[in-house]
């Protein structure tokens, strides 16, 4: 949530800042702004609205200077308007700040600074930081000391970049519970809240850890501990993503591109984990209790993981949303428990907090993560990467199917350790890309289906057993990007209440692969049809055709594989509904790609 970009080097900063902000739009924002330092002055342009409109109206790229910072704001303190947009300055206009996160003690600090004569222009918590640095600079006369002393006063979460008019060769950065990355170029440096912002210029990155600050010049950087002030050595990561991966490549939207990238992404997830999965499966087999956690789509992947690990690994599994786990499982986590944490970004605030809690209680923590070097990978005892590549669309697609693929690989390895016959499922793995492609070939049919459903106000997705999470995920996609009410339900729950909502013409989407719950699922679908539901089914058994208004037939696969292949038509349905309604599926309202605040 929110985006930060900073640049220092030989080039004009403002075009690079604007380009970086555009690459961070998927994080969600309501206003944007940039600042540069030039000839001893801080120059700022900012406002509420979208970057393209602001850049044109305010001529962002006209700002001179070879050092600059930019920000896309998601409002937390203060309404979205021009004044509350970042960057923010102190009283002198010579200190400028951009900040992601929430300063919890900002009101207390603001009152103190007001008593000292500081004048505030905005309602934001961020502006407090600029004035606090101004006050400490007046006392110390040293830029770095003033910066660090100010950081010590802040409570809450922050990723921030500070620029001084009187110190035009350095940017000052800090992180606590919000991501911040240094991009290392050739005689130039970049700061960003996510990798795509500087991907056109460098693939070398350093990830700040919580409680660290840094001083960045065009030729290097130092990173220190906020509390002790001691310098820390940092690992430089080589990012494997290419610039082309983070561009639309001829598709109308990133989401559609990412849906169609799933055959490649799943293949990469399989072959990228051949060595690591056996090691981590061996670790899992030593534990009597496993908890899987995540948020949003990653939580739905966790639910599938529960079915897979229990079925093949014969180990009891609990699944909990990370936002709940960290408050309700404090007395359950111990050194006999293993936690699997699933997070695409590796920076999801609630998931990271749950991982930290588990570690503090002596639990082993395994991460299933997409972004190399992210905070979750540095907290976890071991990490399985999903190898999905950059996912720009806010609604998760390829990162979901690759999470499921990793969980399937892990479960199969556990099954082999337990003497379970995994042959049928293992034989399906090399065919997964073409099986996913079969769903993608339904694109035109699903587009026509979406047209017929465009006026419907309620959708009900039903599934049983391992297909229940697929129903949840299908419903989430509709809600996220088409802004239509949708519920994902366990089909067995229909007659316990939800059936009262089924009436003539209400779409009911049944996720019904062949397997041990199919007969029951068929009965549940017939119940919904008898109440007038418009029945759409996804499955392989031709009996579904007889009870369906629309039957989306997919190749028959082992039930354990079906969550990977059956979600594809549901992703396409959500996408086409969103486009038909005139919504941008890449940037749904009120949502952000990475939820980095609690």
UniProtKB/Swiss-Prot annotation:
Reaction equations catalysed: D-fructose 6-phosphate + L-glutamine = D-glucosamine 6-phosphate + L-glutamate
Annotated keywords: Aminotransferase, Cytoplasm, Glutamine amidotransferase, Repeat, Transferase
Pfam families linked to this entry: GATase_6 (PF13522), SIS (PF01380)
InterPro entries in UniProt: GATase_2_dom, GFAT, GFAT_N, GlmS/AgaS_SIS, GlmS/FrlB_SIS, Ntn_hydrolases_N, SIS_dom, SIS_dom_sf
This protein's record includes keyword Cytoplasm: yes
Disulfide bonds: none
Taxonomic superkingdom: Archaea
Domain spans labelled Glutamine amidotransferase type-2: 2-219
Annotated ranges, domain SIS: 280-420, 449-588
GO MF, any single term: carbohydrate derivative binding
Biological role: Catalyzes the first step in hexosamine metabolism, converting fructose-6P into glucosamine-6P using glutamine as a nitrogen source.
Protein name, per record: Glutamine--fructose-6-phosphate aminotransferase [isomerizing]
UniProt organism field: Pyrococcus abyssi (strain GE5 / Orsay)
Name of the gene encoding the protein in the UniProt record: glmS
């Amino acid at each position: 949530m929110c985006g930060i970009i900073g640049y220092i080097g030989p080039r004009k900063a403002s075009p690079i800042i604007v380009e970086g902000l555009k690459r961070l739009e998927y994080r969600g924002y309501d206003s944007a702004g940039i600042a540069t330092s030039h000839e001893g002055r801080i120059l700022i342009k900012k406002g509420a609205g979208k970057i393209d409109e602001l850049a044109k109206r305010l001529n962002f790229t006209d700002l001179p200077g070879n050092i600059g910072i930019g920000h896309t704001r998601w409002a937390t303190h203060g309404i979205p308007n021009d004044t509350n947009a970042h960057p923010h300055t102190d009283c002198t206009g010579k200190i400028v700040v951009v900040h992601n996160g929430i300063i919890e003690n900002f009101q207390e600090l603001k009152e103190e600074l007001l008593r000292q004569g500081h004048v505030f222009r905005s309602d934001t918590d961020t502006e407090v930081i600029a004035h606090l640095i101004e006050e400490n600079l007046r006392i110390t006369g040293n830029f770095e000391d003033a910066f660090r002393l100010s950081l010590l006063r802040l409570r809450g979460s922050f990723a921030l970049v500070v620029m001084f008019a009187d110190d035009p060769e350095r940017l000052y950065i800090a992180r606590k519970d919000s991501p911040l990355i240094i991009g290392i170029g050739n005689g130039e440096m970049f700061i960003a809240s996510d990798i795509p912002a500087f991907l056109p210029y460098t693939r070398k990155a350093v990830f700040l850890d919580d409680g660290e600050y840094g001083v960045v010049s065009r030729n290097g950087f130092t990173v220190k501990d906020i509390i002790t002030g001691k310098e820390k050595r940092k690992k430089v990561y080589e990012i494997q993503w290419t610039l082309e991966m983070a561009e639309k490549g001829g598709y109308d939207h990133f989401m559609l591109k990412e849906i169609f990238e799933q055959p490649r992404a799943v293949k990469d997830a399989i072959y990228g984990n051949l060595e690591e999965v056996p090691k981590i499966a061996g670790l899992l087999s030593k534990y009597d209790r496993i908890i899987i956690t995540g948020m949003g789509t990653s939580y739905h992947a966790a639910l599938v993981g529960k079915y897979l690990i229990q079925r093949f690994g014969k180990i009891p599994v609990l699944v909990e949303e990370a936002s709940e786990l960290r408050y309700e499982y404090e007395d359950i986590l111990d050194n006999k428990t293993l936690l699997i944490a699933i997070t695409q970004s590796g920076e999801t605030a609630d998931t990271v907090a749950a991982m930290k809690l588990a570690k503090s209680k002596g639990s082993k923590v395994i991460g299933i993560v997409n972004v190399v070097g992210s905070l979750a990978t540095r907290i976890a005892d071991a990490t399985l990467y999903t190898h999905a590549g950059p996912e720009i669309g806010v609604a998760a697609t390829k990162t979901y199917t690759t999470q499921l693929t990793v969980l399937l690989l892990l479960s199969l390895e556990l099954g082999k350790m337990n003497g379970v016959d995994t042959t049928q499922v293992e034989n399906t793995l090399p065919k997964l890309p073409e099986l996913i492609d079969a769903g993608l070939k339904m694109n035109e049919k699903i587009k026509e289906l979406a047209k017929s459903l465009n006026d419907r106000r309620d959708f009900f997705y039903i599934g049983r057993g391992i297909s229940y999470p697929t129903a949840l995920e299908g419903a989430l996609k509709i809600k996220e990007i088409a802004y239509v009410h949708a519920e994902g339900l366990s089909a067995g729950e229909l007659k316990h209440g939800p059936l009262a909502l089924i009436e003539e013409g209400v779409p009911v989407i049944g996720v019904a692969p062949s397997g041990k719950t199919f007969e029951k699922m068929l009965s549940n679908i017939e119940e919904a049809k008898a109440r007038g539901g418009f029945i759409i089914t996804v499955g392989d058994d031709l009996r579904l055709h007889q009870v369906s208004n629309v039957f989306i037939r997919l190749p028959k696969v082992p039930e354990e594989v079906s969550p990977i292949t059956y979600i594809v038509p549901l992703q396409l349905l959500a996408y086409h509904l969103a486009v038909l309604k005139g919504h941008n599926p890449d940037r749904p309202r009120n949502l952000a790609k990475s939820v980095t605040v609690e």
